[in-house]
């Protein structure tokens, strides 16, 4: 029977927590700003860790600048995290921008716009939901006479 949580997954979760703390408390680089660590994928041999991050910025150039600053600081961040974790070999950290949060917000906004548009059209033209029982009775009467 396989373990419910593999060692790489547990290390990834701990690495995510430690990275979040280090990025929030120990990094003083103003180029980075506020960073959210969404997920960490650790390779099976524990040599690499792909760190998915997001920023509270929508401008692609600003996001790329922040990501480049993180990539440049990766060896220093790795050293800080290695001091906090009890691993024989600390994985090499590779930062990747996670656009899923931004895409999810964009999709949510699109759905909200469509819902608001539908509500406006229903108010303007009426809807099938506005049919009363009198309308149904009148329709039945006209069908019976024909």
UniProtKB/Swiss-Prot annotation:
<dbReference type="GO" id="GO:0005829">
    <property type="term" value="C:cytosol"/>
</dbReference>
<dbReference type="InterPro" id="IPR000238">
    <property type="entry name" value="RbfA"/>
</dbReference>
<keyword id="KW-0690">Ribosome biogenesis</keyword>
<dbReference type="InterPro" id="IPR020053">
    <property type="entry name" value="Ribosome-bd_factorA_CS"/>
</dbReference>
<comment type="similarity">
    <text>Belongs to the RbfA family.</text>
</comment>
<dbReference type="GO" id="GO:0030490">
    <property type="term" value="P:maturation of SSU-rRNA"/>
</dbReference>
<feature type="region of interest" description="Disordered">
    <location>
        <begin position="121"/>
        <end position="146"/>
    </location>
</feature>
<dbReference type="InterPro" id="IPR023799">
    <property type="entry name" value="RbfA_dom_sf"/>
</dbReference>
<comment type="function">
    <text>One of several proteins that assist in the late maturation steps of the functional core of the 30S ribosomal subunit. Associates with free 30S ribosomal subunits (but not with 30S subunits that are part of 70S ribosomes or polysomes). Required for efficient processing of 16S rRNA. May interact with the 5'-terminal helix region of 16S rRNA.</text>
</comment>
<dbReference type="InterPro" id="IPR015946">
    <property type="entry name" value="KH_dom-like_a/b"/>
</dbReference>
<comment type="subunit">
    <text>Monomer. Binds 30S ribosomal subunits, but not 50S ribosomal subunits or 70S ribosomes.</text>
</comment>
<protein>
    <recommendedName>
        <fullName>Ribosome-binding factor A</fullName>
    </recommendedName>
</protein>
<feature type="compositionally biased region" description="Acidic residues">
    <location>
        <begin position="130"/>
        <end position="146"/>
    </location>
</feature>
<keyword id="KW-0963">Cytoplasm</keyword>
<dbReference type="GO" id="GO:0043024">
    <property type="term" value="F:ribosomal small subunit binding"/>
</dbReference>
<dbReference type="Pfam" id="PF02033">
    <property type="entry name" value="RBFA"/>
</dbReference>
């Amino acid at each position: 029977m396989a373990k419910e949580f593999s060692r790489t997954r547990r290390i990834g979760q701990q690495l995510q927590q430690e990275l979040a703390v280090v990025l929030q408390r120990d990094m003083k680089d103003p180029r980075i700003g506020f960073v959210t660590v969404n997920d960490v994928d650790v390779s099976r041999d524990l040599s690499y860790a792909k760190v998915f991050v997001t920023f509270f910025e929508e401008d692609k150039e600003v996001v790329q600048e922040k990501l480049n600053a993180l990539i440049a600081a990766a060896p220093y961040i790795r050293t800080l995290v290695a001091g906090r974790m009890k691993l024989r070999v600390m994985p090499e950290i590779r930062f990747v921008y996670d656009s899923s949060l931004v895409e999810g917000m964009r999709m949510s906004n699109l759905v909200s716009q469509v819902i608001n548009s539908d509500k406006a059209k229903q108010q303007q033209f009426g809807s099938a939901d506005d049919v009363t029982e009198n309308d149904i009775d009148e329709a039945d009467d006209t069908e019976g006479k024909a």
